[in-house]
Amino acid sequence: MDIEAYYQRIGYKNPRNKLDLESLTDIFQHQIRTVPYENLSIHCGESMELDLEAIFDQIVRRNRGGWCLQVNYLLYWALTTTGFETTMLGGFVYGSNNDKYSTGMIHLIVQVTINGRNYIVDAGFGRSYQMWQPVELISGKDQPQVPSIFRLREEGETWYLDQIRRQQHVPDQEFLNSELLEKKIYQKLYCFTLQPRTIEEFESANTYLQESPSSVFLDKSICSLQTPEGVHCLVGLTLTSRTYNYKENTDLVEFKVLTEEEVEGVLKTIFNISLGKKLVSKNGHLSFTI
């Protein structure tokens, strides 16, 4: 695997020898704006691989995206290879439907240490929950970013990542009550500890997420990509485009329902990916917000 091929894939052309916060943020933002958060392989009859070589082939060589275990594992490899001090962490995702964190460790997170300060770097949460900058590991501090305010809080040995969101304006009245819209301003995202993890510890989660009937990734075909202004999301046949802070403390969220025939073109033009197999778009009954 070639680190230069990774940098070419994300369009990063700046120096590689500066291991500071500015460079970390730059690399991170290049990845989230070029590598979609997506699970489309499942809905093309393929599996979601956790082997690094397979992930590199999928994302770098075939210009695809992946879900958190894949995109963050690739980011972990790239940052480590570049020379950053990294630690792989495991997260437990909050479910608003039952007001609980997952019992299984289903989210991979990257911690980066720079000059004695620790930062959480997560390129794999997608949608409007996606951080755009590393979040410093400080408890109780509001950390404003373009998408929202992020806040970490420490309780015992567990860290919790929360989000304070803006109001949202939906011009099309038909979608005002869409189940895809996040209704909460204050939203819990996930929790984690600082115990170092290995990729082998995520193998059962990788299997569960693509095989369990209770997995939202089996229930829905999802593709999400950050832009300089906001984020595009495709869930089933529903395409949304969010513009952050289009007016004071308000995001603009625009909806469009596609036909099956339009999906391939939208994936190519908006998300810059092409699928090798036929996609069966799906938006089942499980709760999922953009």
Swiss-Prot record:
Alphabetical UniProt keywords: Acyltransferase, Cytoplasm, Transferase
One of the Pfam families matching this protein, by short name: Acetyltransf_2
EC number: 2.3.1.5, 2.3.1.118
UniProt: CoA binding residues: 103-104, 208, 214, 287
Keyword Calcium on entry: no
Top-level EC class as recorded in UniProt: transferase
Modification(s) after translation: The N-terminus is blocked.
UniProt GO MF annotations: arylamine N-acetyltransferase activity; N-hydroxyarylamine O-acetyltransferase activity
Membrane-crossing segments per the record: none
Chief place of localization: cytoplasm
Reaction catalyzed: an arylamine + acetyl-CoA = an N-acetylarylamine + CoA; an N-hydroxyarylamine + acetyl-CoA = an N-acetoxyarylamine + CoA
Subcellular location: Cytoplasm
GO CC aspect terms: cytoplasm
Active site feature: 68, 107, 122
Binding site for substrate: 106-107
Similarity field: Belongs to the arylamine N-acetyltransferase family.
Function: Catalyzes the N- or O-acetylation of various arylamine and heterocyclic amine substrates, and participates in the detoxification of a plethora of hydrazine and arylamine drugs.
Protein name, per record: Arylamine N-acetyltransferase 2
